[in-house]
Amino acid sequence: QSWQQRACSRARRWSGRIRQLPPRTRRPGFVATRVAPLRIRSLHELPADALLREQLSGQVHFHDTHQLRLDTRQLRSDSLQGLMCDLLQAFVDQPPGGVSGLMRLRNLMVKPLGLRTSHLGCPVSSLLDPSAAQRFAGRFPVLAQRSDADGQHVQIVLGADDKHLRFRSSVALRRVGTHEIELTMATRVSCRNGFGRVYMACIHHAHHHYVVPTMLRAAVGRVMQSDPVTSQAWPARPA
């Protein structure tokens, strides 16, 4: 045999031995499952009972809505209030690098104009506002909030007013099945002047197709489990 044949034969033997080894990433006591990729869809209209509909009563120049469903068996908390807290904390603690890069570029461009700046993506930038009159769960600054009496639907509204526009964003969680929660993130913008309209025309495509979906994937990835656990293993936070 030539040295090439001997090398190939040895490689095949080692490959066979490696494939026979038990997976080391599985933990005893758990059934291995594959987490399905997040499927985010864009809606043309806000849900009929959206709290965001009560915001910006004047003309709305730009809006978008994104929605996805989560499997509660892959979440640390199966209470809607606990999940909302986890998502909002993830928005603050782990903003996606690509979105942060875009925000740094934006800040450099608009700071000389006296506009608001933030290292967080615009939809959630008001989570850093220390002067907010309301706080969700006593922790997170919000403009408005609503929780159904039966605990099946929780909504919060974020946002701010600037020289060129006013924006409002909402995060909503609705229980839609035994093991499913619907997450909806929506934004409405009312422009105050011509510059606001030009500004939104420039950023709307990136906001709709990249910023919001990327923020949602990053936040949901933070609150999901690498291994599914029973709800008893991660007790829900008290409402």
Model-derived segments and spans:
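A short acidic/glycine-rich loop-to-helix N-cap element
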Residues: 189-210
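Hydrophobic ligand-binding cavity/cleft-lining segments
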Residues: 25-129
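Short, highly charged C-terminal tails/helix-capping segments
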Residues: 220-239
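Glycine-rich, low-complexity intrinsically disordered segments
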Residues: 213-214
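Short acidic, glycine/tyrosine-flanked loop/strand segments centered on an H-E-D-like triad
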Residues: 172-195
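Hydrophobic-ligand binding "helix-grip"
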Residues: 131-178
